[in-house]
Amino acid sequence: MVSRVRLYFGYTKPKVWSLLVFVGVIGAIVAINRFTLTNILLILIATVSITLGSMGAEATTNYIDRDIDAIMDRTKKRPLVTGQIKPVKGLYFGLILMFLSIIILLFFSKYLAAVFMAIGLFDNVFIYSYLTKRRTPWNIILGGFSGGFPVVIGWYTVTNAFSVLPWFLFALVVIWIPIHVWSLAYRYRDDYNRARVPMMTSIQSDRISAICISSSAVILFIFSIIPVFFKAMPYTYMIVATIIAIPMLVYSVLFVRKPDRKSSLKLFIYSSPYLAIIFVLVLIFKYL
């Protein structure tokens, strides 16, 4: 029983959805002014809903991608490929989790959050995984919006008040996703070519790929400091965020100068925790 639970848990790709849950929880926390019992319960509701939705989406996309997962070295050990989980069971598991994520929000009358949840799941499962992943090199741009929705789901689970802050955080996630995915895809471009998945990095030259990825990193930095100019964050936040971004910007320049897998890996390694660090900064400066 325990091994089966562990198998299905791993099937949902926790390394992927854990960051989505993290940014969603941050989105919920920055929306409140004080930690009352009601607010804590609302944060818990947001956390559970986002976790179930993210797990369900990843499980369902695993079902959709099972044929190409069998071709790619990086993914050929996933449960549907190895036969540890039957495809139909994997599909139902994902659909049930996604359904529960929306039902929970509706049960607690968090209608706007439920709408954003439905849109995010649709974008991830249908727009990205089913419709565009195998058809266009810009698939991650069209499907990347789903990654930003946990922030606004978290925010609008605890409050109905409008603010520019959650939408800036939403934009940060959406901009960060191509950097993260493309820099990883650049390293595994042979895998994507073998599976006939037209990722931007697998069909463009090394130079163009490096420019696209590095430009995204620069845009990410710019967006990370924009909240200051809307008075959503203090100037001290901008100073700290700029200092933290320097290594990422340096690696971006080096990647453009010498586009190879080693440079791509360095950018991937640093940009991976960058988003989480920025969100922690937002949380800290929110309550300072």
Curated annotation (Swiss-Prot):
<keyword id="KW-0472">Membrane</keyword>
<keyword id="KW-1133">Transmembrane helix</keyword>
<dbReference type="InterPro" id="IPR044878">
    <property type="entry name" value="UbiA_sf"/>
</dbReference>
<dbReference type="GO" id="GO:0048034">
    <property type="term" value="P:heme O biosynthetic process"/>
</dbReference>
<comment type="pathway">
    <text>Porphyrin-containing compound metabolism; heme O biosynthesis; heme O from protoheme: step 1/1.</text>
</comment>
<dbReference type="GO" id="GO:0005886">
    <property type="term" value="C:plasma membrane"/>
</dbReference>
<feature type="transmembrane region" description="Helical">
    <location>
        <begin position="236"/>
        <end position="256"/>
    </location>
</feature>
<feature type="transmembrane region" description="Helical">
    <location>
        <begin position="16"/>
        <end position="36"/>
    </location>
</feature>
<dbReference type="InterPro" id="IPR006369">
    <property type="entry name" value="Protohaem_IX_farnesylTrfase"/>
</dbReference>
<protein>
    <recommendedName>
        <fullName>Protoheme IX farnesyltransferase</fullName>
        <ecNumber>2.5.1.141</ecNumber>
    </recommendedName>
</protein>
<keyword id="KW-0350">Heme biosynthesis</keyword>
<feature type="transmembrane region" description="Helical">
    <location>
        <begin position="88"/>
        <end position="108"/>
    </location>
</feature>
<comment type="function">
    <text>Converts heme B (protoheme IX) to heme O by substitution of the vinyl group on carbon 2 of heme B porphyrin ring with a hydroxyethyl farnesyl side group.</text>
</comment>
<dbReference type="InterPro" id="IPR000537">
    <property type="entry name" value="UbiA_prenyltransferase"/>
</dbReference>
<keyword id="KW-1003">Cell membrane</keyword>
<keyword id="KW-0808">Transferase</keyword>
<feature type="transmembrane region" description="Helical">
    <location>
        <begin position="265"/>
        <end position="285"/>
    </location>
</feature>
<dbReference type="Pfam" id="PF01040">
    <property type="entry name" value="UbiA"/>
</dbReference>
<feature type="transmembrane region" description="Helical">
    <location>
        <begin position="111"/>
        <end position="131"/>
    </location>
</feature>
<feature type="transmembrane region" description="Helical">
    <location>
        <begin position="138"/>
        <end position="158"/>
    </location>
</feature>
<dbReference type="GO" id="GO:0008495">
    <property type="term" value="F:protoheme IX farnesyltransferase activity"/>
</dbReference>
<feature type="transmembrane region" description="Helical">
    <location>
        <begin position="37"/>
        <end position="57"/>
    </location>
</feature>
<comment type="similarity">
    <text>Belongs to the UbiA prenyltransferase family. Protoheme IX farnesyltransferase subfamily.</text>
</comment>
<feature type="transmembrane region" description="Helical">
    <location>
        <begin position="210"/>
        <end position="230"/>
    </location>
</feature>
<feature type="transmembrane region" description="Helical">
    <location>
        <begin position="162"/>
        <end position="182"/>
    </location>
</feature>
<keyword id="KW-0812">Transmembrane</keyword>
